[in-house]
């Protein structure tokens, strides 16, 4: 068991304060810090702290896969850690995006390999052959767009904006089943000629301004989001797509689960992500990065969903609030130690015998495993190899630990 130092990724939409403050580094950071990767993804592996220096977690897995991963995980996933943990800090909206299914990822990866597109190329869609289901748990209030809203609710929103240019698209939704109508409308907007997009976006923004100015409340969040996106990405078809997606606000501790094909865009906030160990992203707009609309359309799931269905259900299990996700690659829980447990050695068994990544989000604790102990304060992480478990915790103050393990 060792302390784990994450790899920081800097993107323009990140925060100069959130990750730096969380990990106890000087604020503000020199650049916007968007993600802190805690895992063994080849793109940015985390580092194990040793008395004589640091070793990448990726190297440690290659050197001792049996001890690090355990026989059960190796039998299912080979010598690869199947999950990746991230701290995500968004001061600005992220791209409109979705992730492929396992079958789509395998096919897409092979196709791009045959085309000779380098894995590091900015126009590469499939950097690996894995799907990328993901869970996001809010550390602070978190805002997102996710999943196609049921058509009836979208029709109400479009009518509330009172934009005559939207009338033909309301008819398009009305005349078909939900999934077919949403597919037809999204495809029409995302593939429209730029002059048509410019006219429609301008009309929608005018309607959103009028709606907000009227003091109406039912769709105030949706209208304000469209205005924000329109200001940041003028003339982007993603501004129109935002009208079709559920607008979600998460309180700390609440989570959303995004399966393959779920169209989403994170707007702002600080959260914890755990996902299958993949970097496959198909983008459709709201970004200066590579956009591949035909490939995005190929992977999207147009079946409508509700905010309640996107929220990750939870249940209590021992110390943990477990987030129920139907994914073999990962499972996640928030472990909580309160005043009555301070100073006591408390068992924190895991459902599985595989490895664990622990991230302290509040307080401080000693983690006790077979190979020794580590001290965790807020923002610090630990790697618990398969042969280090089960673990025990000794909290020195009220403490919360985010734990990621395999799901199986």
PLM regions and their residue ranges:
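C-terminal, non-catalytic macromolecule-binding modules
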Residues: 270-322
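Acidic, glycine-rich loop-and-beta core segments that form the ion-binding/anion-interacting portion
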Residues: 208-277
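Short acidic-glycine-tyrosine-enriched beta hairpin
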Residues: 247-257, 262-265, 335, 369-390
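Short beta-strand segments in beta-sandwich/barrel cores
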Residues: 255, 356, 363-368
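A short hydrophobic beta-strand segment most commonly corresponding to one strand
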Residues: 94, 135-141, 269-288, 330, ...
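A short beta-loop-beta micro-motif enriched in histidine and acidic residues
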Residues: 31-33, 80-81, 91, 130, ...
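Conserved short histidine dyad/triad with adjacent acidic residue
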Residues: 316-319, 331-352, 377-378, 386-387
């Amino acid at each position: 068991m060792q302390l784990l130092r994450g790899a920081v990724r800097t993107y323009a939409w990140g925060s100069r304060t959130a990750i730096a403050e969380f990990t106890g580094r000087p604020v503000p950071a020199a650049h916007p810090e968007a993600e802190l990767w805690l895992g063994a993804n080849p793109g940015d592996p985390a580092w194990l702290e040793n008395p004589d220096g640091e070793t990448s977690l990726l190297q440690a897995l290659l050197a001792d896969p049996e001890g690090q991963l355990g026989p059960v995980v190796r039998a299912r996933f080979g010598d690869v850690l199947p999950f990746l943990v991230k701290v995500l800090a968004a001061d600005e909206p992220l791209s409109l995006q979705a992730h492929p299914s396992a079958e789509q990822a395998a096919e897409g990866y092979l196709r791009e390999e045959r085309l000779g597109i380098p894995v590091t190329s900015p126009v590469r869609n499939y950097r690996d052959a894995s799907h990328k289901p993901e869970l996001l748990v809010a550390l602070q209030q978190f805002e997102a767009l996710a999943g196609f809203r049921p058509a009836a609710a979208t029709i109400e929103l479009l009518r509330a904006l009172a934009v005559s240019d939207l009338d033909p698209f309301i008819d398009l939704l009305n005349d078909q089943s939900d999934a077919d109508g949403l597919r037809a409308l999204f495809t029409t907007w995302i593939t429209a000629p730029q002059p048509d997009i410019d006219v429609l976006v301008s009309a929608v923004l005018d309607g959103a301004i009028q709606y907000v100015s009227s003091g109406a409340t039912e769709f105030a969040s949706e209208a304000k989001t469209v205005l924000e996106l329109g200001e940041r990405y003028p003339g982007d078809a993603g501004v129109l797509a935002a009208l079709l997606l559920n607008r979600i606000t998460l309180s700390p501790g609440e989570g959303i689960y995004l399966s393959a094909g779920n169209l989403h865009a994170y707007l702002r906030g600080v959260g914890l992500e755990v996902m299958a160990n993949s970097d496959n992203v198909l983008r459709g707009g709201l970004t200066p990065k590579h956009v591949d609309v035909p490939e995005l359309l190929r992977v999207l799931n147009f079946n409508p969903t509700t905010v309640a269905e996107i929220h990750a259900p939870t249940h209590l299990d021992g110390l943990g609030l477990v987030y129920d996700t139907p994914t073999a690659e990962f499972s996640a829980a928030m472990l909580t130690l309160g005043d009555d447990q301070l100073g006591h050695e408390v068992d924190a068994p895991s459902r599985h015998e595989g490895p664990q990544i622990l991230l302290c989000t509040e307080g401080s604790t000693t983690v006790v495993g077979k190979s020794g102990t580590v001290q965790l304060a807020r923002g610090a992480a630990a790697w618990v190899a398969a042969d280090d478990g089960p673990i025990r915790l000794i909290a020195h103050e009220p403490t919360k630990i985010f734990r990621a393990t395999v799901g199986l």
